[in-house]
Each structure stands twice: as structure tokens, then as C-alpha cells.
From Swiss-Prot:
Monomer. InterPro entries: DNA_methylase_N6_adenine_CS, Mtase_sm_N, rRNA_ssu_MeTfrase_C, RsmC/RlmG, SAM-dependent_MTases_sf, Small_mtfrase_dom. Its EC number is 2.1.1.172. This is Ribosomal RNA small subunit methyltransferase C. It comes from Aliivibrio salmonicida (strain LFI1238) (Vibrio salmonicida (strain LFI1238)). It holds the Pfam family MTS_N. Specifically methylates the guanine in position 1207 of 16S rRNA in the 30S particle. The lineage of its organism: Bacteria, Pseudomonadati, Pseudomonadota, Gammaproteobacteria, Vibrionales. Belongs to the methyltransferase superfamily. RsmC family. Keywords: Cytoplasm, Methyltransferase, rRNA processing, S-adenosyl-L-methionine, Transferase.
Amino acid sequence: MSYSAPSQITQRQLAYFEGKHVLIAGELNDNFPLELDKHCASTSIFTTNYGYYKQFSENPKINCYFGTELIEESHADMILLYWPKAKAEAEYLLTMLLAKLGKDTEIIVVGENRSGVKSVEKMFANFGPMNKLDSARRCSFYWGQCTETAPSFNLQDWFKEYQVQFKEHTIEVRSLPGVFSHGEFDKGSELLLQTLPSLRGHVLDFGCGAGVLGSVMKTINPKIHLDMVDISAFAIASSIETLKANGLEGNVFASDVYSDTKQNYQFIVSNPPFHAGLKTHYSSTEELLQKAPQNLTHSGQMIFVANSFLQYPPIVEKVFGHCNTLAKNNKFRIYSAQK
């Protein structure tokens, strides 16, 4: 079994976990919890990644929780935090989990050095001591303990509010840490919206993020039946809040690509992700494109934006027989294919 570099450095330090009830959170993307479970009293996972949740939710040995907050009761006395890409997300997870688990909770933090994991020393200062104990494979391993009473946690305090202007429309956006384009209007999404035709029927916004794309589409095309999906619990919560802030209606839910969609669509519209953590990641977008025809209605259309250097047209051509370029600039291209 091949583990990520942060998991490999953790594997060197299994003695720290002996007899502990460990709650794992953060940028975890391998099966290391199964290995860890052999060495500690119990293992549970809190994840904001729906795909990872589905991977472990059927495992009888490990309790796996998905969402923006740990709502369920937990007997964990140790947190293993895989440092996420966004510093604000790390701060969010630390604050939320320590508020839930309380004083005396031990915490181990692992992460790639280039991810900025070193900042945990300063970030954790108000909770208690935090010391670096190991480094290997360009990663660091920290141990700390919460010796102070953690402040109460309120999800609403973590939303960032900003406005997006598109033509004559002003969209109020509410976004949680770690959500794509947190605090700004993505230029790729803007070009996509400028290019879209009039929409009708059932429309899928794949990779909805903070809900900007879906909110603009619903504002301009109020009669559409809008589904908005994302793999991130932070994105789902953000999109729900953004729709609410603009008095709009849409069906927002977690889905690992098409895993939880229930119907075919007249339009699939997307600014698909290609970064997962610190690594460039294409697999979910490839699945989006490859399975699009079977998730579109007869004569349904897929329209998406991508960075110019990404080689998506051959994938689209293979499944649709064609791929049209509707618009482009020096950074992005808008592609379209019709069933």
C-alpha cells in the first residue's frame, strides 16, 4: 500500500497513537486510517470531502463523519490533522475541533513543508504548546496539547461576504474557507457566464463552489430547475448561503461527480476543479466529461470553462464525437458539446 508523504512520516511515529482515541481530519487522501486503527484504541474520521467520506462510510471499523462541523458525539482524545492547502481552512478545523473536544486534547499535525504547515506553531499558541518532533520526505510532524479552554465555535462567524457584479446583476456571495475563488470573482467563471446561451429545463452546476455560477444562472434564467453539486462540504454550505442571500432557489447537495444526481439535464455547466490540495488533479473532471452524455437529456448540452493548456477536447470528442470552442482569451477556453 502506497501512502502519501504526510502519512509516511506519521507511520514512523505510531507510538504516539498507542491507546488513543484518534480523530483524523484535514487533507487526507489515502487508506492510512486502516493502518493507524491497528495501533490505537479507536479511529474516526471527520472529512469535508464527500468522495473520501463515501470511501470510508461503509467500513465497520472506522466511524466517518462528513460536513462542515463535527455534530456527533466523539470520545476522541487526540486529533490527527493533515494540514490543508488553505491556511484559513486549517485555522477553521483547529478551532472547530478543539471547541468540540475540549481541554487536554492532544493534537498531531502533519503536512508538506511547502503547504505552510510551519504556521501551526503560531496558530496553536493560544491553545497550548506545539512542538516539531520529526521531519522527513519534505514533511513535518508536530505534537501539541490543548491546555486552555477553547472558545465556542459558531459557523456563521467563518463566512466571508462579498459582492460579484455581472452585467446589471449584483450577487451577494457567502463563502467559507477552502472554497474555490474565496473572496473574488473567478475570471474563468466570468467568461463562462458571458458565453452561456439562454438556459431552460433542468440545469446542473457541477463544482458549484461558493455558488456564484449557479446564482447568476438562476438570476438570468429564473425558470430553470437548478441542481448545484460539489464534493466539498464547505462549498455546499457556501452555495446554500449564497442562494439564500439572493432570494434564489436551487437544490444544493454533495455528490462525487454524478454519484448522487438523480436525473438527466438539459444543460451541464461547470468551471471544473483541477487542483486537489497542492496537487493538480484531473480525474473528477475527466469523469464529468466522459459520463456527460448519459447524464444529459436528448439534445442536452454541456458547456464548461478550462485553462487553455488543459487537454480536455480529446476527451470530449471521444464521447460526443465533437468539441466546440465557444470563446477563448489568453488564459481560458469555453468548450461545448451537444448530445
